[in-house]
Structure formats: C-alpha cells, structure tokens
UniProtKB/Swiss-Prot annotation:
GO molecular function list: phosphate ion binding
Organism: Huperzia lucidula (Shining clubmoss)
Name this polypeptide is given: Photosystem II reaction center protein H
A GO-annotated cellular component: photosystem II
Residues modified as Phosphothreonine: T3
Quaternary assembly: PSII is composed of 1 copy each of membrane proteins PsbA, PsbB, PsbC, PsbD, PsbE, PsbF, PsbH, PsbI, PsbJ, PsbK, PsbL, PsbM, PsbT, PsbX, PsbY, PsbZ, Psb30/Ycf12, at least 3 peripheral proteins of the oxygen-evolving complex and a large number of cofactors. It forms dimeric complexes.
Assigned protein family: Belongs to the PsbH family.
Length: 74
C-alpha cells in the first residue's frame, strides 16, 4: 500500500508559486541543527521575562498589588 501512495505522489505535479519561490531560501537549512545550545539561553530569558510580566499584570488585575495614586476601574 505504501508503494502505491508513493507512486501516486510521484505522478502528481507540484504547483510552483511566486511566494513559494521567494520563501524557498529560508527553508534551505531544514533539518540541520547547530551544535551546542544556540539561542536557548535567549529563549529562556524571554520566557522568564514574559512570566514575570504576566504575574505583574495578574496581580494588578486581581488588586493584590495597589499602585498609589492610580485609579483602577474595571
């Protein structure tokens, strides 16, 4: 059955579009992994910053933290 599916996929004609041709160079590194940690620490800092931001916003919304002189009306 798998050979039939691959035979069918070989016969189908792939439609090439302008957008596809423009984006093809961006996909040329598909499947390749850079050695080491890469940008993982930057992503960790971004995630931690977003978590702190979310906690601050939730505490302000929940009135756990009040800001003096700033009226909150929601």
């Amino acid at each position: 059955m798998a050979t039939q599916i691959s035979d069918i996929s070989r016969r189908t004609k792939v439609k090439s579009t302008g957008l596809g041709n423009a984006l093809k160079p961006l996909n040329s590194e598909y499947g390749k992994v850079a050695p080491g940690w890469g940008t993982t620490p930057i992503m960790g800092v971004a995630m931690a910053s977003f978590a702190v931001f979310s906690v601050i916003i939730l505490e302000l919304y929940n009135s756990s933290v009040s800001l003096d002189g700033i009226p909150v009306s929601w």
